[in-house]
Amino acid sequence: MNQIITLAGRQEKNDDEPPDPSAISGNISLDEISKIFGLPKASLKQICDKYPARISKYYFSLIKEKGDGIYKQCIPSEAEILDTFGEEDPLREESKIIEGVPSLITHRYPDRALFRISNSCAMYCRFCTRKRKVGDPNKKPTWKEIEKALSYIQKHSEIRDVILSGGDPFMLPDELLEKILKEVYLIISKRENGIIRIGTRVPCVFPQRITSNLCAMLKRYHPLYINTHFNHPAEITPESRKACGMLADAGIPMGNQTVLLKGVNDNPETMKKLMQGLVSMRVKPYYIYQCDPIKGANHFRTKVEKGLEIYKSLRGHTSGLCVPNFVIDAPGGGGKIPLLPGYLQTIDDKKVVLKNYENKLFEYIQPD
C-alpha cells in the first residue's frame, strides 16, 4: 500500500495543459498527517493498509477545521476498521456475477449498462461503495477486460445507455479515455436514442483536470452526459464552478449524485445550500443516495427518516430544479428505489387526498 498522501494548497493552471501528476500522487507522509491533525500514526497506517487514501492538494485546501464536512470525506478514520456491520459488496456488483457478463460490466437494468473503465480516483472517498477495490493496483482494468466489455455491449442490442464509471474515468489520460469512449460511441450511436454517461468526481475534488483539450475531445461524442458528485456546499468554489462551466459550455448536460452522510450534509440547510449552488453552476441535482451499508463506512450512515426529512424540506421550499430524487440503492442488487414523504394520503375511485409542503390537505376529484 502506498502510504503517501497528497496534501498541499490550491493551484491555478493553463486550461490547455494536462493535469500535473504531482497534484494526485503523494508528497506528504503519514508522519506529517499525524502531526497536522493530531492523529495516531499507527492507527493511520492500519487504516490505510486496508483502505488506501489519496487526497488532491486542491481538495485538502478546502478543509477549514478538523472534523468539518470536507475533512470527514477524505481523512482516514479509525471507525473504518472498527466497523463490523457493513458488507464489502452490498450491491452485489461482484459477489453475484452473472454468467456471461464481463467483470467490468454491471447490467442491472434492461437498457443500461455500467462499464468500469478505471479503478483510480483523484481522491479516495472514505464512504466509497467500491472501497474494497478502488486504488488497488492489482484490480486495474486490463485492455483485454475492456475489450470483453465492449464485445458484450456490442452483442446486447437492448443496451442504449452506457455509463462509464470506475474509479473515475477522468483519471485516465485523454488518449486512453478517448479510445474507450470512441469504441462505445461507435456502438451506441447506431442504436435508437443511444446515449453515453460519465460518472466522475473530478470537477469536485480535482477541477484542474478539466481542460479545454478534454472538453474539445468530449464534444465529439454527443449525446454525452456527466454525473458529478458534490456532497457539501464548501465544494462549490471558483475552481469547481470554472470546471463545470467548461463542461456545460461544451454542450454537456450535468447531473449531480449526492450521498447523504452523517456529520457532512445531514441537515436541511446544508443540503438546500448545496442544491441551490449546483443549479447556479448549471448542474442539475439528480439523486440523493442513502449511504450504502459498505464495510468501513457505517459511521456515515443516517436513519432513512433523515433523508425523507431533508427531501421534504426541499420540496416547496426551493425551486423544483433544486430537488433531486431520494433513493436507496437496494442491498443485494435490487437497484435504485425512490422514497417520498407521505404526500398521497388516500386514493379511491372518487377522489385523491393530497398533502402539500405546508402539510395542508387538498382533494383531487377522479374522472368518471
Per-range role (PLM):
Residues C128-K140:
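Iron-sulfur (Fe-S) cluster-binding segments and ferredoxin-like electron-carrier domains
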Residues Y59, C125, Y286:
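Conserved, mostly hydrophobic/aromatic
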Residues E309-D368:
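C-terminal accessory regions of radical SAM enzymes
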Residues P52-I55, V101-T129:
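N-terminal pre-triad scaffold of radical SAM enzymes
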Residues E147-D161, F170-T318:
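Conserved AdoMet/S-adenosylmethionine-binding subsite of the radical SAM
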Residues M1-H107:
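Flexible, acidic/Gly-rich N-terminal and inter-domain linker regions that tether
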Residues R132, G166, Q290:
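Residues that line or immediately flank small-molecule/substrate-binding pockets and catalytic motifs
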Residues F115-R116, C128, V162-L164, P169-F170, ...:
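Conserved catalytic-core segments centered on acid/base and nucleophilic motifs
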